[in-house]
Amino acid sequence: MEGYHKPDQQKLQALKDTANRLRISSIQATTAAGSGHPTSCCSAAEIMAVLFFHTMRYKALDPRNPHNDRFVLSKGHAAPILYAVWAEAGFLPEAELLNLRKISSDLDGHPVPKQAFTDVATGSLGQGLGAACGMAYTGKYFDKASYRVYCMLGDGEVSEGSVWEAMAFAGIYKLDNLVAIFDINRLGQSDPAPLQHQVDIYQKRCEAFGWHTIIVDGHSVEELCKAFGQAKHQPTAIIAKTFKGRGITGIEDKEAWHGKPLPKNMAEQIIQEIYSQVQSKKKILATPPQEDAPSVDIANIRMPTPPSYKVGDKIATRKAYGLALAKLGHASDRIIALDGDTKNSTFSELFKKEHPDRFIECYIAEQNMVSIAVGCATRDRTVPFCSTFAAFFTRAFDQIRMAAISESNINLCGSHCGVSIGEDGPSQMALEDLAMFRSVPMSTVFYPSDGVATEKAVELAANTKGICFIRTSRPENAIIYSNNEDFQVGQAKVVLKSKDDQVTVIGAGVTLHEALAAAESLKKDKISIRVLDPFTIKPLDRKLILDSARATKGRILTVEDHYYEGGIGEAVSAAVVGEPGVTVTRLAVSQVPRSGKPAELLKMFGIDKDAIVQAVKGLVTKG
């Protein structure tokens, strides 16, 4: 960024006028909608005016241009002022602002990516800065471009721990292309924010995390211009002391006005008061960006070579994941890996070894890791793969939920699933993860059962839109597929079948191998079973499951290393509900487990070979 040049008085007045027009638009829109957050918008008016019409470089009619500076409104409830900015810039018709929150309009109550100027959905507070960190990391280390990233946070959301995870990340990686603006307007939703206007404490906290920190009067366009003009070799935090409801007589800095639109009569009077301060209707044109971001193509990324496993050899799917990701990294320099200090367990360390410049260590901060991945994936700049123990992704469920709302394309690999991890005990065992990821809109849930399937899952995930989850296991199990086996999303595999099959058994990961062992044991009793590998739990191959059930007298037995709720059994039951003559019997983990050897735990919770044998015999005996 060039050195600071003080704007002349004409430019400063134009910025003041712009801020007041943004105030007016925010009040008009929320009053027309009958809901919204005008006071939260008004505290940020000067910040937004200076950012978009003095500091940022972007093409106003092409908001997602890869060269543009980025902006994340972490305090998403102030969406009306963001919409007002894009109307002021000429991208939105001003009349559209009056359709705020209507079902016929794209201007939702909080920012969402159906708006071309919104990269990530916000509104669940505390997440915007993490996404901004991902954008800034991508700009600095992958794109090596001059675009900068700005994120505005409210003081209420600074109580969220995820904010400080992001602050730490930016400080560690010296993201000097990132600016966080803290709108310290003193008031939260139901009470004052904990620090109110103690801006010096905010400053000390930010500095402790490695940020260059500046305190400003958030309603002084001159102070804001100067603060944004300071370039340092570290991220910058601007602590802007503001007043909630600034410019609204009788409401400014008053409690009990959060999320309340002004009544029509009051709004008209306030708008007249604010408008009387506007000296010129002339609008400031956006400054175009420097066009130095590289052209990127992340479509159709394929493995450079087929799998190279041997049927019968043993490998844990968690290790197969690391090998597959490292291999895929050679197909595109836009494949990146993130981990939460578990890379020697998830085997993402294999990717780091071969592609060290594309590995991001996020440390033990899973919420932030997911937000970083979302930021890295914006504008199709990268294809991120995040990994940690599957159990620890539960901590980041809100970030994953918001990633889906953001229409983000990120891939999450959770290792150490189920009781089969053994001695580490229940705190490390993922037993809720299938339920969690199945509930995410438009998600794809992979559950590979050998090394070949894992490699195919990684390749498919890289080319599948939405949130992809790959569930991997700790135990080593045999390779059961040939290297040329074709895998597709939503296509299950019949691993074992005969014309005399009496029960269809569906397992995945460890339990698929237990099912195959059970099939061998049942042969002694002249009982044949059909064994299915679903490969993806979502979407599920309903047709193959039903065809198999009909061929085995309508009997389905599911067995899974997961709790009963939300797992494979419930997915299969939902898929076949209403089908005459088809019944589903389920085996799953029924209570909080304990430490023990994997085989002991599989037996204790009734999901091992012997439990499958007994369940099959029971179904056959019933007739």
UniProtKB/Swiss-Prot annotation:
It comes from the Eukaryota. Its EC number is 2.2.1.1. Keywords: Acetylation, Calcium, Isopeptide bond, Magnesium, Metal-binding, Phosphoprotein, Thiamine pyrophosphate, Transferase, Ubl conjugation. PROSITE patterns: TRANSKETOLASE_1, TRANSKETOLASE_2. One of its GO terms (biological process) is pentose-phosphate shunt, non-oxidative branch. GO terms for molecular function: calcium ion binding; magnesium ion binding; protein homodimerization activity; transketolase activity. The modification N-acetylmethionine is found at M1. The modification Phosphothreonine is found at T287. Binds 1 Mg(2+) ion per subunit. Can also utilize other divalent metal cations, such as Ca(2+), Mn(2+) and Co(2+). Binds 1 thiamine pyrophosphate per subunit. The modification Phosphotyrosine is found at Y275. Thiamine diphosphate binds at S40, H77, G123, S124, L125, G156, N185, K244, H258, F392, Q428. InterPro entries: THDP-binding (IPR029061), Transketo_C/PFOR_II (IPR009014), Transketolase-like (IPR051424), Transketolase-like_Pyr-bd (IPR005475), Transketolase_BS (IPR020826), Transketolase_C (IPR033248), Transketolase_CS (IPR049557), Transketolase_N (IPR005474). The modification N6-acetyllysine is found at K6, K11, K144, K204, K232, K241, K260, K538, K603. It catalyses: D-sedoheptulose 7-phosphate + D-glyceraldehyde 3-phosphate = aldehydo-D-ribose 5-phosphate + D-xylulose 5-phosphate. NCBIfam families: PRK05899.2-5. This is Transketolase. The gene is Tkt.
